Amino acid sequence: MIHESAKQKSKSYFDSHRKSRLAHGGYWRHDYRYQLEEIGRIMPERLIDIGCGPGAFLCLVEETYPGIQLNALDISPEMVRETRERLSDTAVATVGDSEHMPLEGEQYQVVTCNMSIHHYPHPQDALNEMYRILKPGGALLLNDMDCAAPIRAVANWVFPRLPGGDVRMYNREEIERMVRKAGFQSVRYRKISPFSFQCVAKK
């Protein structure tokens, strides 16, 4: 019940914050350049952003690499609507649960997930799904919060009390373990700011 309530809180919060600076990635745009660099090395035909919010990251992908077929998934219908309005007509944005994606397997060369996994009650299920929808040889580009242990402990106490559906902040060992358990290989984890990380892994 607690987990389902976290999902509902997340959906309701982001539905009502469609135009906010936070929803548009204002606090985390610094991290996007690292994700864009990895995309540039791969140059996939198809990419999907999981937990896309209002499409701020995908707008940058579209501007930087206009030839990529862009796809998006978010649990919030309002965020999906915003994404559809901001991207070109060729982009596909879907309402769906990251832990149970309404998507066929082995479709994408790249799966991105930016500042979203800390909202998932069952992150292992979400990572398993990301692995499933990736083509063999495809890449996961995961970006989320990474803070010192005392800050993380406080955050994990506060998160369930916040309105946004935040569930848990994970440390490096937890992220690497879950990513590998999903089946990914060549896992690379690095700090990209005092408060965030990037994890790149291959299927």
Predicted regions and their residues:
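A conserved beta-strand element that flanks and buttresses the S-adenosyl-L-methionine
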Residues: 112
